[in-house]
Structures are given as structure tokens and as C-alpha cells.
Amino acid sequence: MNYKKKLSYSCLFTILIFIFLSNSYFNFEESLIFGGADGKSYFDISKYSPYLSKDPIQPIHAERFFFPYLIGIISKIFFVDIYTLNRIFVFFLIILINKYIIDFLLKFNIDKHFIILSLILLNLNPYFTRYYIAVPLIINDLIFMLGSIICINSLDEKNKKQFFFGLIISSLARQSALAICISILFIKVIKKNNFFFNYRDVLISFTVFLFVYLMGYLYSSNIPIEGTRSEQYFITIFGLFIENKSFKELLVYFIWPFLSYGPLIIYSFLFIKKNFLQIKGKIDLNIFIIIFSFLIIFQPILQGLEVSGKNIIRLSTLAYPAILIFLIINPEKKKINKFRFLFFITLCLIWSSHPTFSIFSFLEKVKF
């Protein structure tokens, strides 16, 4: 293991120890308050696994049954509490996602300071590591992000098998994986024969997604459900346009995602030169990240305030690792200044001290 890799893992270890020691650890009931209806749905799927759920579940949640169902089977085989098992898998997934990102950045020969900054930006984001440790039932989000990172890496390596593996993982976790297929189609239409995917591969990607979706549809069609599927999907796409909200309410709604993306924006001002949108080669990879991230962030916005609410922060953060990778590998960086470097780390530590997801309470008065 070379010096840069050792340093990266040492920094990751230090950051994670700090988070593990200072994080909130909600019990089941608390996690439902701060994690929303998704967690209850996933728990019920696990509870009744290997059989079908007897409790009503929202169809859109039931379609993501695969991993909660698998966790339920594992919990019964090894006699481990479902909630505890989810938290164990959250720890594992956080480490795995970090490993993928470190290995990916090392391929680009990224300066050690910027690898450290990337680990800080990822893990001190209160809506990434802290959130999922505190609310472990929303594990499907982490699995989705892992799958998207695998797809990003596959495009860099031009590895089709790896891409389909990542797509399957993401599709089993969330219907949002459709964004991966659309992004690939977009690249193919733009680049035509200059893209290593042919139209058959694009068709296969949509077929894979559709097959996984139909598995979820089959599960959700054989259990009691809350609400109707058509109504949920209609609101998912058109919710924002059928709401009657004041300008102030909508303004606050659109500001919420900045609670997750704030440090990344500040990083851009502090460490990236003026040619912000300069793309260094890897056109396919960069187009994919841009289209994918746009679709992922746009979807919870379309749902509207009544459905998404503060969940817009969590749902928009599904694109956070992809955007982080884009900003680390592309724009030309400013020369590292020790004061600026330490100032930013301090800022991220403060930003990470979320009064809900950490043991720190000094930011309680600025919650909104």
C-alpha cells in the first residue's frame, strides 16, 4: 500500500471514529420520527420475511422490498435483531462507499490534500454518515449510492459487466435507478458510435431495470397497501404543480438541500479556480454524472413540499457522492493554503455537529 493510500485510510479511520463517538443512535421509535415512513415500511418487510408482509405498506416502498427482505432472512438465521442488523450493515456500507471513492480518486492521481477534503466533505455531511447511522432503517439509500458509484467507476474503466452490476444494485434499492438508464441513453444519443455502449447495451440496461421493477411490483401487488400506486406516482411526478404553497414556503423548501450541499459549495469557492466548469477528458463519465445528478435532485423537487417535506434534503443527497467525485476530478484546483485548508476542516466539523444527528447541541438555535 503506497503512502497516499495509507494516508487516505488513516484519515478515513480518524473521521469515522470521531463520528461514531459523537453520533446520535436513535432507537426504533425515534428513527421513525426522523427517518419518515420509508423506515417503517422496510422494517415491516424484514419482520415478515421470508413471507409476505401482512401490514399495509405504501406501494412505492414495497417495490423496494429486496434488501429489507434479505435482511429479514439473515436476522432470523443468525438470531440478530432487525434494527441492530440494519445498523451493522450501515457501518459496512459506509466503509465500502468510502473505499470505492478513495480507490477511484487514486486512479486520477488526485493530490493527497484533496483526497482528505473529499473524505471530510463526504463523511462530515450530516445527511450522509451521521444520518444513516442514526436512522439505519433507510439503508436502501446507501445501497443505491453504492450502486451509482460502481456505475461511475465502470464508465471510467469502460467495463460493461461492472456497470450492469452497479445498475442491478441500484435498481433493487430504489426506482431512482431509472436515472442511470436515462443518463446512458443520453450519452449514446449525443456520442453515437464514440460511446463504448451500443444501443443493444442501452436496451439491456432498461430491460434490467424493468425486470427488477417488475419483481418489486409483484411483491407489492400481493400485500396490503396504503393508498394507490397510480396516485403515488402521479404525485411523485407532478406534486409540485398541484400544491398551493406560498412563496415563503417554497423558498424554504428550495433552501433545505443546501443544508447538505453547503460545504460542497463553499469548497468550490475556496479550492477551485475560476474555470469552474472545465472538464478534463473523460467526457462520457462527466456527462453521466451531470445528467444523473440532475435527475436525482430534480425528482424530489417535483414531488413537492407536501410529499417530500424535509426529506428533500435526504433525497437530493442521493446524488452527493457523484457530484463530489465530479468536483474533485475535474476543475483545476487552487494551490493548497494551510490557513484555508484548516479553516475549511473546522467549518465542516461545525457543519457536522447537527443537533439532531450528533451529540452536540450548540447549533440548536439555528435549526429551521
Give the positions of each predicted feature.
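Transmembrane-helix motifs of polytopic, lipid-linked glycan transferases
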Residues: 88-109
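Membrane-lumen/periplasm interface segments of specific transmembrane helices
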Residues: 21-22, 197-275, 289-297
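Membrane-interface alpha helices of multi-pass inner-membrane proteins
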Residues: 148-149, 161-175, 180-186, 207-211
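Aromatic- and kink-enriched transmembrane "portal" helix at the membrane-lumen/periplasm boundary
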Residues: 65, 83, 87, 94, ...
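Transmembrane signal-anchor helices characteristic of membrane glycosylation enzymes that use polyprenol
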Residues: 6-35, 207-220, 296-298, 345-354
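Perimembrane helix-loop-helix junctions
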Residues: 3, 180-207, 277-279
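Specific aromatic-rich, kink-prone transmembrane helix
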Residues: 140-162, 166, 322-326
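Short hydrophobic/aromatic helix or loop-helix immediately within or flanking a transmembrane segment
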Residues: 39-47, 57-80
